[in-house]
Amino acid sequence: MEADRGRNNKVRCAVVDTNVLMYVYLNKADVVGQLREFGFSRFLITASVKRELEKLEMSLRGKEKVAARFALKLLEHFEVVETESEGDPSLIEAAEKYGCILITNDKELKRKAKQRGIPVGYLKEDKRVFVELLD
């Protein structure tokens, strides 16, 4: 089900994955703006994912390098949270700990989050955010 423009108050916080942050620049999608329209007011990124973006900025070239740099600039609007785990598990840990939805285009990560009862969201091909809320 698509998010209902803020009428559902259960989920107000979003943990965002690297692939979504990179997609924002590469595909000119206003993910944060769309999530705000849906009533989300708190955006989290794990320290692990921030480090991953910093490494990508150093190692990538061309558009991807610029996308990583843009994503790091976008993080000025995010809370960086520490987790015990690294990488994808850190996103699941943060979503559980803070009661957030997980926004990712990683199919395996979405599957794992759903198994743990974490609501997920992702970007569709038309650049719109699709949010699957749990009942």
UniProtKB/Swiss-Prot annotation:
Enzyme Commission number(s) of this protein: 3.1.-.-
Primary gene name: vapC9
Keywords: Hydrolase, Magnesium, Metal-binding, Nuclease, Toxin-antitoxin system
GO function terms (MF aspect): magnesium ion binding; RNA nuclease activity
Protein's recorded name: Ribonuclease VapC9
Xref: Gene3D superfamilies: 5'-nuclease
InterPro entries: PIN-like_dom_sf (IPR029060), PIN_9 (IPR041120), PIN_dom (IPR002716), VapC_family (IPR022907)
Quaternary organization: Dimer.
Provenance organism: Archaeoglobus fulgidus (strain ATCC 49558 / DSM 4304 / JCM 9628 / NBRC 100126 / VC-16)
Domain PINc: 15-118
Family recorded in the similarity comment: Belongs to the PINc/VapC protein family.
Record-listed Mg(2+) binding positions: 17, 88
Function noted in UniProt: Toxic component of a type II toxin-antitoxin (TA) system. An RNase.
Pfam families named in the record: PIN_9
Cofactors, names only: Mg(2+)
